[in-house]
Every structure is written in C-alpha cells, then in structure tokens.
Amino acid sequence: MRGIIKRLNDDGFGILYNKILVPFSAPGDEVEVLKTEKQKRAKIATEWRLLRSSPIRVGARCKVFGKCGGCILQHINYNSQLEFKKEKLRKILGREVEIIPSPRIFGHRNRIDLAVTVNAIGFREKGKWWSVVDVEECPVFGKTSKKAIERLREYIEEEKVSTWKIREDSGFLRYMVLREGKFTGEIMVNFVTKEGELPDPTSYFDFADSIYWSINRSKSDVSYGDIEKYWGKEFIMEELDGVKYLIHPNSFFQTNSYQAVNLVKTVEKFVEGEKVVDMYSGVGTFGVYLAKKGMKVVGFDSNAFAIEMANKNAEINNVEAEFFVASDREVDIKGFDTVIVDPPRAGLHPKLVKRLNDHGPETIVYVSCNPKTFKVNIEQLNNYIIEELIALDMFPHTPHIELVGKLRRLV
C-alpha cells in the first residue's frame, strides 16, 4: 500500500489512510507499506519503504535511529516537533498553549539506563522487550556515554563478566545506569546485577565521581535493586539556577537539567503569596527552589526516601523548608497561599480534588506530564479557573510534553 503520511498520532506514529500506523515516518513522507502487524487496536507497519521525503524530515544524529525505541521524532526538524506538540495540546485541551523549547536538544538527558546483554549494550528495540539495540553512544545524553560504553565493554571482556540472556533470564550484569550533573559535570555509574560477586570496576571508570552496585533479587526486569556504594561520593550534585540538589541512584530527578531550570522558574512565576505547600514533592525540586527564593515551604510525598533527600537538599541550601511523609489523601491544605501539585501520570486522587475544591487556597500550580489527566482534573476542579498555562518541551525527539498551569479560585 502506497500513500502520503498526513499527520502523526499522539504517540508520534505516522497515520496512513487513517488505518495504518507507520513508526519513524513524518507528515509529508510518501511511503510504501510492505508488511503490517495487528497490535492492540491498530495495524502497525513493520516493514515499509520511504519513497519521497517530507520537507520537514532531517537526518537523525543517532546511528541506530529507527531501531532504538527512545527518540521516535529525531528525524523531524525541531520546529516541526514543537508544532506537533502544540497541535496535540490543542486537540486534547481545546486551546492554544505556548511551548518553551528545550535549550538543548542533544546532550540534555542526565540519565540513561543501558541494558547489558550477551549480544548488545544499549536500549530496547521499539516494541520488542527481548531485543536490545547495540549502541556506541547516546546523543541525547552526550559525550560521556561514549566513554562509559567503551569502558564497559573493556570491563566485561577483561574481567570476564557474565552478561544478560534476556529470554533465559540468566546472566549476572543486567544494567549500567549512567547519571550526570549537567551543570556540575559530576558522574555516577550504577551497576545493576543479580546476586554474585562484582569484579572491581574502579580502574575502568576512573572518570566517575561515584560508583554504586545494585542487586536485583526479584524476577522483575528493573534497573534498580538493593544498593550499596562501591566507590567515591555518596551523592553527585546538580545545580539549577544556583540551587543545589543531591542525586542518589534511587532518586527521581527531572531528566533534562537545562529545561528543568525553565520549569522551576515557571513554577516560581505562578506562585502567589509566601506560604506554599509542595504536594508530591519528591526530592524537593520545586520546594527547595522556592524556599531559596524566600518562600515558606512545607512539602509532602508518600515516598520516604524522597522525603529524606528533600530534607537533605533543604539543608545543603541552608533554607527553611520542611518535608514530611504523607499520602496525597492525608495532607491538610488549609492556611496556605499556593498549593503546588505534581502528580504521577494518573493525576490527582479524587479525595485531594474534593479537598482542593472545598478548602483549597487562592492559587494552585499544577505541573503535569500527562495532558489528558490534566484536562480531567481541571474539569473536576470546578471551583478554579485556569489563569495561565505554559508547556515545556522537557523531552525533545519524543511525543511527551510537560504542562504548568496556574489555577485561580473562583469561590
């Protein structure tokens, strides 16, 4: 079947004749689909030819683009990526939303999780959990990835390290997680293994500031486990607009440090008053930043380790912010000027929505990684109206987008 790709779906797949999804295609491409496969409710083109390129198509910087499942939009020029995301938001939210572009579109990621198998070191092939695409480097992470992967290959060969056979679920070394403070240059390497003995990696990774070893004792395919520091610093550090953050292997942190600066600045701009409650606070990314700007912050999260890290981050920045373990259903939100919510993709818990409607402050700042649940929650928060809404491209070359909304109380 031949035809021209008219548009992309929300996941970044080209749509041919409204019935076949063509991965790694671009609007305006003329394609010939040779083979399809039924997946869930759609037909996916598993083999296709590009007959004529779209004017918005560019050469992908990554050598394994089209195989690796990470950067599905890297073949589309960046302005067109932003237009795609604007149209996606327009369709979901029914309104125009300004998008702040990422300051960098390569070398911006501060974390990658490299699968380490007998056949390849790299990332999952698109749609194939059992297949890993071998890579020499990751352009969205940057130059350090090339050095780290080269050293990892040397380490495996010279120390005769057993690696992962995915289908058999055998082998010792499963993942190497690489993290980098983009504004500090500090590097952390975390080896994720099954039970056994880890040959000393320190001479191979002498460029790292911190080396960790995590043992995954479960049957789950995850890149974390029971953890211990092997060598070097307990934490590496990242810095956003003069505010310091400690990074631990088990910490969640915004993966695009350069755009995270714009994110915290946007949240600060939307906050009204001095007394702020930081829901879903994580490691204190927003709360510590706002406290550094002179606001009185109390934060809550259900993850005890995240709260421990948030309090450490408050301490190293010498700010008066306190963080406590609590679920989103328990927190007393009375007496604050602004509530910040940054929920998981599933959105706000219904009990929190009710409490916000009944007793919420004048202002809510809603940070969302899922426009669809954002829309649902905004409709449920019927005592509030959107006063300002900005999107940030935290994830270049992917279909994902971050939203920050300022909500003002009506009654």
Swiss-Prot record:
Where along this sequence does the record place binding of [4Fe-4S] cluster?
62, 68, 71, 138
Q: What is its EC number?
A: 2.1.1.35
Q: Could you cite one Gene Ontology molecular function of this protein?
A: metal ion binding
Q: Which PROSITE patterns match?
A: SAM_MT_RNA_M5U, TRMA_1, TRMA_2
- Pfam families associated with the record: PabTrmU54_TRAM_dom, tRNA_U5-meth_tr
* Catalysed reactions, as listed in the record: uridine(54) in tRNA + S-adenosyl-L-methionine = 5-methyluridine(54) in tRNA + S-adenosyl-L-homocysteine + H(+)
CDD domains, sorted: AdoMet_MTases
Q: Known InterPro entries for this protein?
A: MeTrfase_TrmA_AS, MeTrfase_TrmA_CS, NA-bd_OB-fold, RUMT_ARLMC_TRAM_dom, SAM-dependent_MTases_sf, U5_MeTrfase_fam
**Family in the record:** Belongs to the class I-like SAM-binding methyltransferase superfamily. RNA M5U methyltransferase family.
Q: What is the name listed in the Swiss-Prot or TrEMBL entry for this protein?
A: tRNA (uracil(54)-C(5))-methyltransferase
